[in-house]
Amino acid sequence: MKRVWVTGYRSYELNIFKDNDPKVQVIKEVLKNYLRAQLELNDDEFWVITGPQMGTERWGLEAALELQADFPQLKTALMFPFAEFGKQWNENNQLKLTSITQQVDFFANVSDKPYQSPQQLRNYQQFMLTHTDEAFLLYDPEYQGKTKYDYEIIQKYKEESEYSMTFVDFDELQEEAEEWAERQREKDEF
């Protein structure tokens, strides 16, 4: 069994405010390519474990859910850092969160209490590190966002254990965007 923590930028950090933004398709394609490469190595159970943030985490789950028909060994888990996560979000985002919660194979709160302190977020990070074998980050250290905290704790954890990290930076995203645009042009020509 393999377990990967998928995380990265929030949608607003990438200036993405609509689900149909072409950047979402590019990011999901990057995520699918990574997952396919991992899944094609063997038929062992493979878990995508992530959090509830709008952005990379949700897109990671959506990408995994789209691949499940072709890869029955692929499982999805959504972990909230604390109870009632997202209750302050607008209704549309709450509906999206509820929807993805109902589609995953496993869902739980790391802390059963509503938000009380930053310690719950640190506990969440520790939980994710100790319950996964590697991390996939959509993150560029030159353009820090909230993912900086996950990146730093993963770097530190890697020094103490056999934990690996794959991260996709903006240069790699740009390459994929150009390839995606070319594929779209080819489709339009036919």
Curated annotation (Swiss-Prot):
SUPFAM superfamilies: MCP/YpsA-like
Gene3D superfamilies assigned to the protein according to its UniProt record, in alphabetical order: 3.40.50.450
InterPro entries with a match to the protein in the record: YspA
A UniProt-annotated Pfam family: YpsA
Superkingdom field: Bacteria
Family of this protein: Belongs to the UPF0398 family.
Protein name (Swiss-Prot/TrEMBL): UPF0398 protein Lreu_0922
Species of provenance: Limosilactobacillus reuteri (strain DSM 20016) (Lactobacillus reuteri)
